[in-house]
């Protein structure tokens, strides 16, 4: 059954099923160039959020079917993992329907990956990564709009796994934290073991282009497959590590927010099962 929410972002049309409302792949930002910082999404739009559409600058919201504006349900923001190079906000193994039936609004956030998301540029501020900036823009969108979905913007928990946990912790740094979430649950956070400066030569060799915003935006526009091939060449040199990602995390730089850092015992069990299903194990 069709359902809709009207909020500052616009009128968002989703679906209601089995006591749960789902709003899929809502754009939360505008990305002019692949290596540019995100801009806030346009407001006042009519948005078809009835089906998931993979995309980096989108998020999905799942709410209890009875949620009304101002209901103040707690909000869980899920940032997916994937070694900073794969994953998507459309993943549903986080069981959003179960969260909704328990009275929790869940938001799943997509962000830029690989070189567009995590290749530092010399003109960037220290500690700045576009993939992290995407997630920060998503949190700002949530602050502006989630109350219309029945969520409480003052009771937001950011949850991440692997690369997503690293991003969650990075967002909790004092130079990034803007008070848009109350607590963090970081499960098996994964960071590169070496700074990007030690890998810059490999990046230049893989892309054969200057590492400037203008040159990289041009390469992405003109020949995205070449950039993807370049990333594959680059990352094969770091198969036992995250090839890119925030680095380094200093715990003394974290803001005063409630924080749980833990590990997941069976986070890779699905990989073996997938290989078995494909008869590759």
Residue ranges and their predicted role:
Residues 130-134, 162-167:
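Active-site loop->helix "elbow" adjoining a glycine-rich segment at hydrolase catalytic centers
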Residues 64-71, 97, 147-152, 175-178, ...:
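Surface-exposed acidic, glycine-flexible loop patches that form ligand/cofactor-binding
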Residues 165-176:
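Short glycine-enriched nucleophile-adjacent loop
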Residues 56, 126-147:
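Alpha/beta-hydrolase active-site loop
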Residues 1-126, 265-267:
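Non-catalytic accessory segments of hydrolases
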Residues 149-161:
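Alpha/beta-hydrolase fold nucleophile elbow
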């Amino acid at each position: 059954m069709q359902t809709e929410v009207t909020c500052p972002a616009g009128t968002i049309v989703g679906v209601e099923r089995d006591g749960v409302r789902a709003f899929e792949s809502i754009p939360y930002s505008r990305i002019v160039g692949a290596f540019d910082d995100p801009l806030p999404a346009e407001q006042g739009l009519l948005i078809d959020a009835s089906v998931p559409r993979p995309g980096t600058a989108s998020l999905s919201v799942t709410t209890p079917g009875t949620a009304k504006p101002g209901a103040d349900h707690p909000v869980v923001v899920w940032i997916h993992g994937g070694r900073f190079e794969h994953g998507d906000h459309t993943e549903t193994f986080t069981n959003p329907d179960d969260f909704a039936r328990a009275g929790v609004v869940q938001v799943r956030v997509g962000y830029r990956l690989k070189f567009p998301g995590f290749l530092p540029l010399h003109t960037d501020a220290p500690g700045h990564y576009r993939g992290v900036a995407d997630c920060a823009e998503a949190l700002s969108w949530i602050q502006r709009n989630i109350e219309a979905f029945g969520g409480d913007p003052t009771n937001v928990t950011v949850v991440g796994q692997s690369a997503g946990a690293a991003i969650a912790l990075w967002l909790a740094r004092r130079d990034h934290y803007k008070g848009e979430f109350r607590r963090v649950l970081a499960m098996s956070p994964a960071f590169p073991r070496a700074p990007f400066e030690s890998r810059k030569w490999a990046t230049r060799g893989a892309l054969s282009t200057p590492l400037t915003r203008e040159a990289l935006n041009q390469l992405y526009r003109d020949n995205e497959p070449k950039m993807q091939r370049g990333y594959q060449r680059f990352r094969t040199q770091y198969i036992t590590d995250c090839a890119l990602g925030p680095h380094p995390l200093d715990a003394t730089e974290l803001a005063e927010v409630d924080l749980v850092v833990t590990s997941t015992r069976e986070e890779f069990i699905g990989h073996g099962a997938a290989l078995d299903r494909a008869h590759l194990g």
